[in-house]
From Swiss-Prot:
Signal peptide: none annotated. The gene is tat. It comes from Human immunodeficiency virus type 1 group M subtype B (isolate JRCSF) (HIV-1). Pfam families: Tat. A motif (Cell attachment site) lies at residues 78-80. This is Protein Tat. Residues 49-86 are annotated as: Interaction with the host capping enzyme RNGTT. The modification Asymmetric dimethylarginine is found at R52, R53. Zn(2+) 2 binds at C25, C27, C30. Residues 1-48 are annotated as: Transactivation.
Length: 101
């Protein structure tokens, strides 16, 4: 190895900087471009802002921490509560009483 000027900072040593600039490409050649590219692209290590992660849902069986809610009434049927058979009879009665139509 050739001697290096001790007054130079390590990142300014000859040969420490690549001749070409770093790119956003993730091909094998660009991932091995320099040490920075290798750690960020190749290994996926970055010390910048963290990406937002989705929260993991708790397992279904661990509901001991939740306050018990009162049971809701069973779903009520929509529409006529008398049922479809009685409504048909009702329509028949109305048509019998109005023979004018």
């Amino acid at each position: 190895m050739e001697p290096v000027d001790p007054s130079l900072e390590p990142w300014k040593h000859p040969g420490s900087q690549p001749k070409t600039a770093c790119t956003n490409c993730y091909c094998k050649k660009c991932c091995l471009h320099c040490q920075v590219c290798f750690t960020t692209k190749g290994l996926g290590i970055s010390y910048g802002r963290k990406k937002r992660r989705q929260r993991r849902r708790p397992p279904q069986d661990s509901q001991t921490h939740q306050v018990s809610l009162p049971k809701q009434p069973s779903s009520q049927q929509r529409g006529d509560p008398t049922g479809p058979k009685e409504s048909k009879k009702k329509v028949e009665r109305e048509t019998e009483t109005d023979p004018d139509n």
